[in-house]
Amino acid sequence: MIGVEHCDRCGFDRSQWNDRDAERTIAHAGAFLVEWSADAPPELMAKLDARRIDDLKAISTSPDLIDEVHHLWHGLVSIADVRRAAGDVVPRQHGTVTQLSASGGGVPKTAISSAAVGARGIEGDVQAARAHHGRPWQALSLWSQEVIDGFAAAGHPIAPGNAGENITISGIDWSTLHGGTIIDIGGVRVQLSAPAVPCQKNAQWFIDGEIALMDHDLHPGSSRWYASVLQPGTIATGDTVDVSPI
């Protein structure tokens, strides 16, 4: 894997990475591998645990920081492959894009009718805190319309785009998603990479600043999801969303 520029198997593209993004990503390698194994059936966990140990060993012995990222992504895709081969897949679901959102930096993001999406996300969308956002696996942020509606019904002053998600989706059971899930949105294919950690900037959308309500670890099925872009294209409000058990 040393020096590979692009990997068709895992989607790794060296040109999309710099040392800072790679270093911050590798710091959470173990958490990534655990997240992509989450909720796997007991009969698979021993196999996934052994694979995770091998992946972490390969990462730790790699001579190059960017190559470490490649090892990590290979490991993640391997986990997805093992789960898929065993029939441990997210159920096929169909939903709809209820809002696309972008901004020149910070929250809230504002609604747009359509967008071109590349490897780095929605063209023209800017992340205010680049140190914590904008890595290839954070190209897009997705959230559930039903989750937002539930918060709003409880009295929280939140609406689509407020929390910084780019794509708000209805009709998908958010509690069924996990790392590695592949979703087709309009003309774009994405892969879920990790749940987004709540940001203090979003405290304004919750009564008493209770951002823990959107924390994946505390409230599974309530968080935004980061996604990498597997196939660039365009998305428009009202487009079909397909969760693929592949």
Language-model regions: role of each:
Residues I2-R189, A194-K201, T234, S244-I246:
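Electropositive, beta-rich accessory/interaction domains or terminal extensions
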Residues H156-N166, I207-S223:
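Short, basic/aromatic beta-hairpin or loop at an interaction surface
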Residues W225-I246:
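Well-ordered alpha/beta subsegment
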